[in-house]
C-alpha cells in the first residue's frame, strides 16, 4: 500500500498567529485581571443624532442610555455582577464591553461635551477644548475615543495630531454616516472597533477608525458622502485592519522618540487659509487672499505641485507675500501623489519662496501650518524649516541610503531555509517570533550596540516576548539607565504591560532603580488605578520591615504614602507601631 504523503505543517505565520507578542500585533497573554479603561469624548456628530423638524441634529444625554441596551457595546450581566453602576471605582456613565478574544475587559466612560456639535460647526476653539480634555484625563485612562461628525473629522484628527505633543497613548476618532439609533447603521461597528483599538493596543498616535480600518489621523480625507467606506488614506496604508482578526502594521506606527511628557498645545494660529489654483485665476484674487491678517496659506496646485509659469502677475503676488513673510505651503490637488519640482512650472513656485508640502493632505497641511505659525519662539526661517520636517508622520520622507532588511539577514535566511519557508508572510512571522527574545536578551546585558543593529535591520524595539515583556521592561528591571534612555529615544512605550500587568515603571520600582524611575516619570510614565490597587498594603509592609528604599521608590513613582493597608492603617502608623525610626523620619519628611 502506498504511504500517505506527509502533511506539510501549516504556514508558520498561521501557526504563530495566536502567539505573536504584543509589540508585534497581538496583545500579551492576559493577566489574571486584564482590564483597560477608555475615555470616550462625545463631541456630537451623526453617530448620536436624532431626527427633528429641521433634520438630523445632536441630542444631549441620550447616547449612554441607548448604548446600555446594545449587547455588543455593554455587558449588562457583568455590570450587574460587579455592581459597576454603584462602584466608587468607576465614574458615572461607565459601560463595559463583553470580554474580548484576548480575555480582556474594556471599561469605557462617556464624557459628553456641551453643546454637542454638528462637525460643520467645529472651530479651532473646539479642537482646543478636546485637547484639554485629553490632557486633563490623560493619566486616568489607557486610551481615548473621540466621537465626531464625519464632515470635518479629518481636520480635527490632523489638528489634534499636532496639538498633542509627545503623545504616548492611543487616541482614536470615529463616528458614523448613519445615527447609531437606526436599524441599519455603521455607528455600532465603528464605535466597537475604536474601543478595541484604544483599549487593547498602545498605538501612540491620533488615529481615525472607520469601516474596519484604523488610519493615521493626519493622513486621511473624506472621499465619499454616502458610503460607509467614507474615508481614505491615499498615501499611507492603514495602521490596522479589523477583519476576522485585528492586524496591526507596527512598522508603520509613528513613535514620538522623546523623553518628554505628554502636553497639549492649544494656541493655534487662525490666520491661515486654503487657496486652490484654477485655470484663469486672477492676480487680484490671489492678492486679496494674501492680505493681512493672513500669515500663511496652503496653495493647492496641479499635479506634482505645478502652477502656471507664464502668469507673471500671479507669481509676483506670491513673491511679494513671501517677502512680507507670509508662509506659503504647496500641496497637490490630486488625491494621491506628492509635490515635486520635476517640471519647470513647479520649480517656478519654489523660486518665489513657496515651500514644497510633499504628500500631505490639505487638512494636514492647513493644521500643520496653523500649529507651526503659533510657535512664537521660532523665527520665520525656523517655521519654514519646521514645515518641511515630518513632525507626526504627516508626510513621507524618503530615507537616505540603503536600509538593511531583516529579510536579507543571513541569520533569518538560515532559519527560514531550515523551516522550508520562503513567502513574505512566513518570513515576517519568523522575524516577529525571533526578534523580541533577541532584543530582550540584549536589553538584559545592556548591549546598546546589539539593539541598535536590530533596529537598523527594521526590528521593532517595542515588541514584547512570549510574556509581553519588552526590552524596556528588561532594561528597567536591570537598571540599565543608558539603555533605557536609548529605548525611549527609539520610540519604546512606557505604557506597555506584560502578561502579569506590569509596566516598565513597576519593574523599576520593584528593583529600586531610582534613576530609571526618575527618567520614566520624566517621559510620562505614571501609576494607573490598576497599579495602585493593593499599594496601601504593599507600602505598609515596606514600613513594617524598615524598607526606606522601597518606600522612596514608590514615592518617586507618584504613589500616595498615606494610603491605608488592609487593616485601615497607613505606613506612618505601621512604622510607629513597629518602631521603625528611619521609616518614621522619612515619612514625616514627605508629609
Q: What is each of the regions a protein language model found here?
A:
Residues 3, 7-136:
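ATP/NTP phosphate-donor binding region
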Residues 34-35, 41, 63-81, 91-102, ...:
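Accessory alpha-helical/coil subdomains and C-terminal extensions
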Residues 431-439, 464-470, 497-503, 530-541, ...:
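Ankyrin-repeat boundary/"N-cap" motif
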Residues 450, 482-483, 515-516, 549-550, ...:
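Conserved ankyrin/ankyrin-like repeat signature
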